[in-house]
Design a protein with these regions (language model features):
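Charged, low-complexity intrinsically disordered terminal segments
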Residues: 1-429
Length: 429
């Protein structure tokens, strides 16, 4: 991507480019930081790079926004980094889906939105505020192009739509908690009549679980369908997040007396699990939320997030849900819609169209829980959040109990390592 950005800068002598990254990436993923640093240091002086550390300890900047000339913007779940490329087919052994070293990359499911007009301008305002907060520099609003910007080959799904922009921002310094995304999620769940459809990398947010649980307890409440990855990207992440997911699934299943709850992971034609990184909630055919926010506590009140939302009877909303599920099930959209019309139930439609041998959806089963996972789930050390009542702790991030528990976890790890060394040096006869 660096070579592409450099080429664009060379082609457009007046272009200024601003790259803003979370400062925690220096520690968490230093390799992903190097391309941006290289562009800034060795590239054009019109490429400006900054690290943003204005967040509580342990939090991160998770918004995924690209804006151009105040007139075009992307907002969604896709990071501008490696190993994110794939097609909707998620073909097995696709030679184009490779890592930097040439090794195969796993199938990846992600979603973003593109927009022009006032919505793009509002996202530009948000981005300039983020830059000013990080650097102290106020960027001028650029002149709007005479002609609208829209990439060739990108289909338009709707025109003249009213878009809401929702944020999560943790309390920090003199800033109070902003939990617009959580509030919109809860309002949408409460208003649902027929179906709540969710795609998310995680499924651990307590407030969302409580809201879904209340709807499943109702005699005539909505169906709830969740699409998640089968497993996390590391064993530690599995322990930190998917033990919590176990607990959420157990709670929802315990109140699901009408058999209206399902949680799946997608597979391709070779039965490879497709990693789900998309962040979407669609309620009935009237509300869609799409952006950077997962269904976890961090996204509700600890990290910075940005979603866009659309509300109202709109073909775009129903078509998006049909397109996503038709993709996961490996069928055409028309076939999916006809089956849904016949059943009038999303779960029944999935049951009929789901293939056990080809591309399809598989039920997520409870994972075994180890000691580390139980500690992380009990403390929510890796999935913490602020609530509106906790502004007094703004800027402190991890609480003292979390620091103590990190020390305990490190001690457990060291003891385990010493035991492993002892066993290697004293094998059983």
């Amino acid at each position: 991507m660096g070579a592409f950005l450099e080429a664009v800068i060379e082609l457009k002598p007046q272009l200024q480019m601003y790259l803003l990254k979370w400062n925690g990436a220096v520690v968490v993923a230093p390799g992903r930081l190097l391309p941006s640093v290289a562009l800034s240091v060795f590239g054009s002086d019109r490429i400006h790079f900054a690290l943003d550390g204005h967040h509580p300890f342990g939090a991160c900047h998770h918004q995924k926004i690209v804006v151009a000339d105040d007139s075009f913007a992307f907002c969604g779940g896709i990071d501008a980094t490696e190993n994110r490329w794939d097609t909707s087919e998620h073909l097995p052994d696709d030679p184009r889906r490779v890592c930097k070293d040439g090794s195969p990359a796993k199938p990846w499911h992600d979603v973003t939105s593109a927009m022009t007009g006032a919505a793009a301008s509002a996202l530009s305002d948000l981005s300039r505020k983020r830059w000013e907060r990080a650097t102290g520099e106020q960027l001028e609003r650029p002149p709007v192009p005479d002609r609208p910007i829209w990439p060739e080959g990108l289909d338009t799904c709707g025109r003249n739509l009213e878009i809401a922009i929702a944020r999560t921002e943790p309390p920090y310094g003199d800033r109070r908690l902003v939990n617009e995304i959580e509030n919109l999620f809860l309002d949408s769940i409460k208003s649902a009549k027929d179906v709540i459809y969710i795609e998310s990398q995680y499924f651990t947010a307590k407030s969302i679980c409580d809201a879904l649980s209340a709807r499943l307890e109702e005699k005539c409440g909505p169906e709830v369908i969740v699409i998640n990855p089968k497993a996390a990207q590391s064993d530690f992440e599995n322990d930190a997040m998917h033990v919590l997911r176990n607990r959420m699934i157990e709670k929802l299943q315990s109140v699901d007396h009408q058999d209206r709850f399902r949680i799946y992971y997608p597979v391709n034609a070779a039965q490879e699990p497709i990693y789900v990184h998309a962040k979407i909630m669609i309620v009935d055919q009237t509300v869609i939320h799409l952006g950077s926010s997962n269904i976890n506590d961090r996204s509700m009140g600890f990290d910075t997030e940005c979603n866009v939302a659309l509300k109202g009877e709109n073909d775009l909303i129903s078509h998006t849900r049909s397109r996503l599920l038709a993709e996961h099930l490996g069928v055409g959209i028309d076939h999916f819609d006809q089956t849904l019309k016949r059943h009038a139930s999303l779960i029944a439609t999935i049951d009929e169209l789901n293939s056990e041998t080809e591309r399809g959806l598989r039920s997520i089963k409870k994972r075994p829980e180890n000691l580390r996972g139980k500690i992380l789930a009990k403390t929510r050390m890796m999935d913490q959040r602020y609530t509106p009542r906790e502004v007094s702790t703004a800027g402190k991030g991890m609480r003292p109990r979390h620091v103590a528990l990190i020390g305990t976890a490190v001690a457990i790890g060291l003891l385990g390592w010493q035991a492993w060394k002892w066993r290697r040096g004293n094998p059983r006869q």
